[in-house]
Structures are given as C-alpha cells and as structure tokens.
Design a protein with these regions (language model features):
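Residue-level detector of the short coil/turn that links helix A to helix B
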Residues: 26, 60-61, 95, 129
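Position-specific recognition of the canonical hydrophobic site in helix A of tetratricopeptide repeat
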Residues: 23, 57-58, 92, 126
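Canonical tetratricopeptide repeat
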Residues: 17, 51, 86, 120, ...
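Structural marker of alpha-solenoid helical repeat scaffolds
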Residues: 2-7, 41, 76, 110, ...
Length: 184
C-alpha cells in the first residue's frame, strides 16, 4: 500500500472503505486486517469500531472485544440507528434477548424505515415470547424492500416463526450443536 505518510485520518478512511469492499467480496481475512489497520490509525472512529465489532459478533468470534467496540461506538454516536442496531444485534447473538429488544426498539425509533433493523427486532421479539409483534416487524421488514437474498428468510419467519433452521442466534446455534453432539 502506498499511502501518504502523516495523514492518519485519511488513511484510516481508505483502509475502512477497502475493508468494507473486501468484506462484501467475501474476503474476510483481508477485510479484518484493513479494519484493524483503520483502528490503529484512528482508535476511536465509531464507524470502524461498529463495523468490525458487528462483523465479529455476527460471525460468532471475538464476542467480548466486539461487544466492547460496539459499546464504544454507541457512546460516541448514541443517536445513530445503525450503531444502536449493532448493539441490539450483539445482545441478540449472545442470547441476551431482553437487552436486545431494548436496544433494537431504540434503533427502530432512530431508523424506522430500515428493513434489517425491523427484521432484527422481529427476531428479538420472537425470542422473548412477543410473537405477534415479531410477525408484525417481519412483515414490515418485508414491505421495506430488504436485500433480495434476505426476502425468502423473512417470508419464512412470517410463515413459521423462528426455527432452528432460520435462527440467527449464536446461543441457539450453540445449543443446536450441543444437542446434535457436535459441540458443547
């Protein structure tokens, strides 16, 4: 990489955007390295903290560090619906559904028209037994035109609720592995 010396902020942004491109191109190890480099140059950049922390938690890796990073991002940007969604989703992924609901409801207040946040809140509602509200959120997520690959998943949740096959919870996936004798 040939980037100008002494311009940490600009270089951090460059690594951050390249990391996003790599992550979306399914090149996770390169993306992770670039996100870490971006943080090295700007340790408190909330978008980088959020993106890397969310990515780790969504993959079920580095959960403690990912959660700390997202909390730092929320402290800096408490009114950013996407960052608050990340915190709610992090709680969901570790099985803390009550805190997930609280944060995801806040994220919806901030970004009501985002299909992913509505989908996340639907999942959290389902986990705390608020099934009618869950189906409403999923229907709303569907109507907000989610990414094409997400639409069949959302429609399956509307029809069947959360099942082991469509669950996004690390805790639920760990339980399934334990039940299947594959982990524990």
């Amino acid at each position: 990489d040939v980037l100008p010396a002494g311009n940490d902020k600009a270089n951090s942004v460059w690594y951050y955007y390249r990391g996003i491109c790599e992550e979306r191109s399914k090149q996770w190890s390169k993306a992770e390295a670039d996100m870490k480099k971006a943080l090295e140059l700007q340790p408190d950049q909330p978008h980088v903290l959020n993106y890397l922390g969310y990515s780790w938690i969504d993959q079920g890796i580095n959960l403690d560090e990912g959660m700390k990073m997202i909390k730092r991002a929320v402290e800096q940007r408490p009114d950013d619906g996407y960052i608050v969604d990340s915190l709610g989703w992090a709680y969901y992924r570790i099985g803390n559904y009550e805190d997930a609901v609280k944060n995801l409801e806040r994220a919806i207040d901030l970004k009501p028209e985002d299909p992913t946040i509505n989908d996340h809140l639907g999942d959290a509602y389902w986990r705390v037994g608020r099934t009618l509200e869950a189906k409403f959120q999923w229907a709303h997520a569907r109507d907000l035109k989610p990414e094409p690959e997400e639409l069949p998943k959302i429609e399956a949740k509307i029809a069947n609720g959360l099942t082991e096959d469509n669950s996004n919870s690390s805790a639920a996936q760990a339980e399934k592995k334990k039940d299947d004798g594959k982990g524990g």
